[in-house]
Amino acid sequence: MAKKVEKLVKLQIPAGKATPAPPVGPALGQAGINIMGFTKEFNARTADQAGMIIPVVISVYEDKSFDFITKTPPAAVLLKKAAGVEKGSGEPNKTKVATITRAQVQEIAETKMPDLNAANLESAMRMIEGTARSMGFTVTD
């Protein structure tokens, strides 16, 4: 019989840098799972994506065992990396901080496709463009 999921924990952790310190430790401690076991496994799985923030969904079972699914980095993180900026605009409608090309948007949309609720690449690109605009980026052809 399949194990019963007791709790789902969602976190965003820098790839390869999970530690028992907050925010990871307290979130996992409340769920009652082995914090060191999770951090070692997460760091091993995400070592190749250093520098990115990786969303993770941890399923905690009744017997306190767990497994987790890593997702693709948030669109905002990928956009900032592609544009080479530290952060988006505080006033996106007035102040534009960077320019990004449609080719870069397409590349990000292809990366994010498994996690996006989009039927095709074109709609995924529109989602990414919307995120870029809300961050104060200009999208050019």
Swiss-Prot record:
Keyword terms, alphabetized: Methylation, Ribonucleoprotein, Ribosomal protein, RNA-binding, rRNA-binding
Any Pfam family matching the protein: Ribosomal_L11
Posttranslational mods: One or more lysine residues are methylated.
Gene3D superfamilies given in the database record: Ribosomal protein L11, C-terminal domain, Ribosomal protein L11/L12, N-terminal domain
The keyword NAD appears for this protein: no
Function per UniProt: Forms part of the ribosomal stalk which helps the ribosome interact with GTP-bound translation factors.
Subunit description: Part of the ribosomal stalk of the 50S ribosomal subunit. Interacts with L10 and the large rRNA to form the base of the stalk. L10 forms an elongated spine to which L12 dimers bind in a sequential fashion forming a multimeric L10(L12)X complex.
Family per similarity comment: Belongs to the universal ribosomal protein uL11 family.
Protein name: Large ribosomal subunit protein uL11
Organism of provenance: Streptococcus agalactiae serotype V (strain ATCC BAA-611 / 2603 V/R)
